[in-house]
Amino acid sequence: MNDAFLYFALKKAVPNSRRLYFTKGFTLVEMMVAMVVLSLIVLMVAQLTNNAAVLFKSTRRMDTDTEARLIFNRMAVDFGHMLKRSDIDYSTFKSPAATLSATYGGTSLAANLQPGNDECAFYSETDGYFSGSSQPSGQGKAPVALIAYMIANDPVTGTPSLQRMGKGLGWEPSGTAGAWQNVTYLPMQLISQWSDLFNGDPDYKTVGDDVFRLEYTYLLKTSPSAASKLSITPWDTTLGHTSINGFSDVAAIVVTLALLDNTSRKIVFSYTTLTSSLADAANGQSTAVAWNAKVSGSSFATTAGLPVQAASQVRIYERYFYLNTLQESSP
C-alpha cells in the first residue's frame, strides 16, 4: 500500500515532461520582421548621428564666419579713418627699405619685411582708451587714437589670437611719464615713442580668438606706367618713389586672415608649423587664393602638423579696405 501511495503522489507532483518543457519558438517570418525593424532603428540612429555631426561642423563654420565679419568691420572703421599724411611715420607697416624725402633730411628707414604674421600701427580718427587712472580733461583729449594690430598669445588661453590696441592720445603729452602721449611727426618714429609697441604693451585686447594668421598686401593705384597690382611695397617703384609718403600710391590695404575654431584648437598642440605652412604675401599674388589652395590640398594636415579633423576646419578670409583717394596734406 505504501508503494502505491508513493507512486500516485509522485505522479501528481511531477507533471508530464513534454507539457513542462515544451515552448513555442519564433517563426522565420517573425525573425525576418525583427531584423528589418532592428536595421531601421540602426539606420535612424546613424542618420541622427550624421546630422548632428554636420550641424556641429556648420555651427563651427558660422562661428568663424561671424568672427571674421566683426573683425573686418572693426578694421574698416580703423583704416577708413586712418590719418594719411606725408609728415607721419608709417614704418610699422610692412615694406622694404625706404628713403624719406629731402623735407625730412632724406632719412633712411630699415626694411620691415615681417616674416610670419604681420603687424601694423597707425593713427586713426576713432575712439581710444586710457588704461591709466588719469586722462586728458576737456579739450585736451585728442580725437585721434593710436591703433595697432598683431598676432600674440591670448593671456587666458595661451594660443595665438588677433590683438588690437586703441590707445587714447592727448593734444599734448601728459606731465606724468607714461600716462598718455600725443601725435608725433617725422622724422620721429612710432617705435621710438612707444618702445613696447609690439612687445608687451598692456593696452592690447583680444578681438579674434580664432585668428592665428595675419597677412596684408597693398593694392597700388593705376598709373600711366603700371596697372593696379598687389604689392608688398606700399609705393610705386615704377614712378621712382622711395617711401610710403602718406599712402599716396596705395588704393587699398588687403587683409587676409586664417582662423581655426576653439573646438578644433583643443587638439592642436603647436602653431609654429601651422603658421609657417601658410606662406607670406608675395608681389602680384592674392594671399587668400594661395592659402585656400594650400588648405584644400590632400597633404595640408601633414605639412601643417595638424590632426586631420583640425586641418579640415581651417578657414581663410580676405577683404579689401579702400583708402580715401584724397591725400591729407601736412600743415
Question: Which residue ranges define each predicted feature?
Answer:
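N-terminal leader/signal peptides at the extreme start of proteins
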Residues: M1-F26
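Short secondary-structure boundary/capping segments
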Residues: N2, L55, Y271-L274
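Short, charged/polar micro-motifs that form catalytic or ligand-binding hotspots
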Residues: M31, R61-D65, Q139, D201-Y204, ...
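Alpha-helix exit/C-cap motif
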Residues: Q47, N51-L55, L70-K94, D154-G158, ...
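Short, glycine/small-hydrophobic-rich surface segments
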Residues: K57-S58, D63-T64, F79-G116, S225-S231, ...
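Short linear sequence signals and composition-biased patches located at protein termini or domain-edge surfaces
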Residues: D87, L113, N199-P331
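Surface-exposed loop/linker segments characteristic of extracytoplasmic
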Residues: A98-S223, F247-A252
